[in-house]
Amino acid sequence: MKLATYNLNGIRARLPRLLEWLAREQPDVVCLQELKCADESLPIADIESAGYGAVWHGQKGFNGVAVLAKGDTPELRRVGLPGDPDDTHSRYIEAQVQGVVVGSLYLPNGNPVGTEKFDYKLRWMERLCAHAAELLKEERPAVLCGDWNVVPEDRDVFSVRATQHDAVMQPEARQAWRRIVHQGWTDALRAFHPSDEKLYTFWDYTAGCWQRDLGFRLDHLLCSPEAADRLQGAGVDKWARGEEKASDHAPTWVALG
């Protein structure tokens, strides 16, 4: 099973790129983020024509997440992250595909630091930490994947000095990330590329970041022990970022046996 995560930065604007990537890479399961699209406006017919069933949690103009499965419709388990019934942001959806629990998440960016946006990010991460612990109790293959908006280590960004004030770099966010990982989750991409220094998944549109490879590793796939036992590979489809009118993120994937 090839399971991928892809922040589209607008599904309607990037639909040609999504369909091109699906046809070329043929992933079995896809977690999408930043649909920026209401439920009724999702181009589901195009997705189905590409051979994928889908469940989704949309929001007009912002956020939005989905899970796609090739030749099947994912079994929906949860819409929204537990812990705050007043949170209306469409940032989490969970489904089951071929016995694997898949969570597609779009973690809050948190900028600017020192505002309610950053506080919300940390609260959201605490809720995710609690939910991740509950998932592990099920003792089944599970993968939490998406745009985490966290740079885990200094080597996961092109320049610490240039980005030190960004919310994705803050110690509180990194500590929250580690609390989740230390529950027993495996950072699959780093596990297969332990020494890579430019293991990026995101390149900003501004200042020629893509052309100069000034990137961040923001998109992660965390595997439960039962999923980690089946890991066969992981990578980044970097070519997709270089296409015309591409998302600022590249698809990132794991292979499970």
Language-model features: where?
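Active-site beta-strand/loop signature of hydrolases that rely on acidic residues for catalysis
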Residues: 6-7, 22-40, 102, 131-154, ...
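Structured beta-strand-rich core segments of catalytic domains in phosphoester-bond hydrolases
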Residues: 35-36, 44-112
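Active-site-proximal beta-strand elements of phosphoester/diester hydrolases
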Residues: 1-10, 99-114, 145, 249
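Surface polyanion/phosphate-binding segment centered on an Asp-His-Pro turn
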Residues: 235-257
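Surface-exposed cleft-lining segments at the edges of enzyme active sites
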Residues: 82-83, 108-125, 161-166
